[in-house]
Amino acid sequence: MSHKIMAINAGSSSLKFQLLDMPQGKLLCQGLIERIGMANAGITLKAQEQKWQQTAPVADHREAVTLLLDMLTGHGIIRSIAEIEGVGHRVAHGGETFKDSARVTDETLAEIERLAELAPLHNPVNLLGINVFRQLLPDVPAVAVFDTAFHQTLNEAAYIYPLPWRYYEEFGIRRYGFHGTSHKYVSATLAEKLGVPLSALRVVSCHLGNGSSLCAIKGGKSVNTSMGFTPQSGVMMGTRSGDIDPSILPWLAQREGKTPQQLNQLLNNESGLLGVSGVSHDYRDVEQAADAGNPRAALALTLFAERIRATIGSYIMQMGGLDALVFTGGIGENSARARAAICQNLQFLGLSVDEAKNQRNATFIQADHALVKVAVINTNEELMIARDVMRIALAETPVAASA
């Protein structure tokens, strides 16, 4: 039986959405409403081979969702909003409470609100999106899908920071990890493509984009991940530094009089590829600058690959070996150069890349003689969200869909 499921990602001034026909995972439409709250909000809707774009005043998220539902019926994608049988919402932070996606109830919403102190930029707007859909589609079941939930299988040695214990007990300061929905999707899809149970695999998943994180997956469970208490930590990213010596921060505060807010701005918005290259946060722009002879751009690319390679190495040691390395995200899926740089000099591990396969973005890019599979898999967090709606709200197990 077919079910129409919506996957929603609400931002502070945007609303991304997909409508999927489940359990087949067929994409019926997708779109984005951006610049919410402004007179020139951008509205994009794609369905099959058709695309509609316009600008219009969109006062708030309620108006955005109303517009979205009107577009679905107005363009004939569905006959009535009654056809929507479930809604899945991406939520940034589930803390230690949510070890899986959860049906939206008053209790669920109260806990998401309580956890907003751990994700003050994201949980409140995620909550806003959920509440608007509850008001406009009160009889449609909803599921909250948490970026952090997949990493709740980490053991204490992986998630505890070596700080005084009371900071964990009182404030919940620990490694949480993010991009969990993406890491879960690509590892499951990898196992499908290999025809091997995920429980039998040791995988390192590399979600590389403007925000990047790595995840060690053993037996289908996350055993380590590079992002920590916040999405700022781990490997170098587009504008985020990743891990640095923490004493740099009080030193800068004393030397330049920087406030905590200014230091946070520096680490999150002025560092990474942008900070080192001085060119851009976009990997493609930095590549072009490096090819034009910019030494700082070349250094930024080297640093990016080195930090990722070092993390991969530590995860291989932790898992006692590696069966597959997976690349996903905007950079991971599209930059053959980044993949080649990251896999450089790893032949001693049985990991090497075939240049021709890599250049054409083949699904498997390892050399014929390589012991370790190297895969390029387009992530599909929306499909993962829709699957969780089916599993939790509609009590059905979705069939596997290819990436």
Swiss-Prot record:
One of its GO terms (molecular function) is propionate kinase activity. The keyword Transit peptide does not apply. It comes from the Bacteria. Signal peptide: none annotated. It catalyses: propanoate + ATP = propanoyl phosphate + ADP. Pathway: Polyol metabolism; 1,2-propanediol degradation. The keyword Protein biosynthesis does not apply. One of its GO terms (biological process) is propanediol catabolic process. InterPro entries: Ac/propionate_kinase, Aliphatic_acid_kin_short-chain, Aliphatic_acid_kinase_CS, ATPase_NBD, Propionate_kinase_PduW. It is found in: Cytoplasm. Keywords: ATP-binding, Cytoplasm, Kinase, Nucleotide-binding, Transferase. Works with phosphate acetyltransferase (pta) to capture exogenous propionate and regenerate propionyl-CoA during degradation of 1,2-propanediol (1,2-PD). Belongs to the acetokinase family. PduW subfamily. HAMAP family: Acetate_kinase, Propion_kin_subfam2. This is Propionate kinase. The gene is pduW.
